[in-house]
Amino acid sequence: MKPKLLFEQLLSRQDLSSDQMQEVIHACMTGEFSDVQIATFLALMRMKGETVNELTAAAQVMRQLAHKIDLGNPLIDIVGTGGDGRNTFNVSTACSFVVAAAGIKVAKHGNRSVSSRSGSADLLEQAGFILNLSDSQVQNCINQCQLAFLFAPHYHPAMQHARAARQQLGIRTLFNLLGPLINPAQVKRQVVGVFSTNWLKTIATVLANLGSERSLVISSQDGLDEISIAAKSEVVEYRDGNFKQWFISPEDYGLKHSSLDAIIVDSPEQSLHLIQSVLSGDSGPARDIVLLNSAAAIYCAKDGISFDAAIEEARIAIDSGKANLCFNKLRLLTQTLNKESNHE
């Protein structure tokens, strides 16, 4: 599709067909479009608003171009779209250790920051984790720690063609929405946080279109892309072919309604400090938001468990020291695996 025709169509607020969307995403991902053309496309899509069909088609192309990894199933991913502009610490990354410590295998798909102050990869590298691992090393992480981090650039090398355009734009784009939809381990269960309640049903429907067995898509009424401690959060749950809407407030589960101020960070260092505090058992707003969001993943991963019981499992995973042990064990394992591969 010629860029000029594409831009005219989007300027007139006409949606793209699935075929058109696949063609355009392929052009973006193979270097056919220039940085300016990619940025223009992303900005116009943002202005028009991305549809279920467009996102499904885009994710299908991204999955086809990805380097896939088979880590077995069941697996879960906990991920946010970002783009909420709130600069909270890396809640979903912290939750990964808690959920793994609760006995659930987690394939956490993440990247460096594009529009926030601390992406999951920025945080993990600050903590000393080695992210550039081979497939067999990643499998080793899952086997030994129930958790592996899938560094997006390694599995989606085609994304390099859009990186400059995304960084120069510096705003939420289509790719924030796509990130949670293209886990290279092809997880069947996911908790996805989105930056606006307007996107809940859209993202849940796209996940269903892409073969998800069960998903929770979450957004809080204060604009956080996860369950909030400062406001009611809305959930669209997909399970057994059906969608269900429900709400979560911290008070419903014996947790305090708190300001977000205590969980705002300016850097990966600050985010790491908060995560280590939570995993060490410290109480406060950071712990509460990790409990709520870890519980969402445990609830999504386990059949027949209540949300109350999931919160208790998350609490035990932290207070027993298992979540902190998972953090330290996985960090050491990634370092050891990296040294071994360097000596081969």
From Swiss-Prot:
InterPro entries reported for this sequence: Anthranilate_Pribosyl_Tfrase (IPR005940), Glycosyl_Trfase_fam3 (IPR000312), Glycosyl_Trfase_fam3_N_dom (IPR017459), Glycosyl_Trfase_fam3_N_dom_sf (IPR036320), Nuc_phospho_transferase (IPR035902)
Binding-site residues for anthranilate 1, renumbered to this chain: 80, 111
Cofactor(s) in the UniProt record: Mg(2+)
Superkingdom of origin organism: Bacteria
Annotated residues for binding of 5-phospho-alpha-D-ribose 1-diphosphate: 80, 83-84, 88, 90-93, 108-116, 120
Gene Ontology cellular component list: cytosol
Amino acids binding Mg(2+) 1: 92, 226
Catalysed conversion reaction: N-(5-phospho-beta-D-ribosyl)anthranilate + diphosphate = 5-phospho-alpha-D-ribose 1-diphosphate + anthranilate
Source organism phylogeny: Bacteria, Pseudomonadati, Pseudomonadota, Gammaproteobacteria, Legionellales
Family label: Belongs to the anthranilate phosphoribosyltransferase family.
Protein name, entry field: Anthranilate phosphoribosyltransferase
Free-text remark on how the cofactor is bound: Binds 2 magnesium ions per monomer.
Keywords: Amino-acid biosynthesis, Aromatic amino acid biosynthesis, Glycosyltransferase, Magnesium, Metal-binding, Transferase, Tryptophan biosynthesis
GO biological process: L-tryptophan biosynthetic process
GO molecular function: anthranilate phosphoribosyltransferase activity; magnesium ion binding
Positions that bind Mg(2+) 2: 225-226
E.C. no: 2.4.2.18
Functional summary from the UniProt entry: Catalyzes the transfer of the phosphoribosyl group of 5-phosphorylribose-1-pyrophosphate (PRPP) to anthranilate to yield N-(5'-phosphoribosyl)-anthranilate (PRA).
Chain sites annotated for binding anthranilate 2: 166
Subunit (UniProt): Homodimer.
Gene3D superfamilies: Nucleoside phosphorylase/phosphoribosyltransferase catalytic domain (3.40.1030.10), Transferase, Pyrimidine Nucleoside Phosphorylase, Chain C (1.20.970.10)
Pathway terms, separated by semicolons: Amino-acid biosynthesis; L-tryptophan biosynthesis; L-tryptophan from chorismate: step 2/5
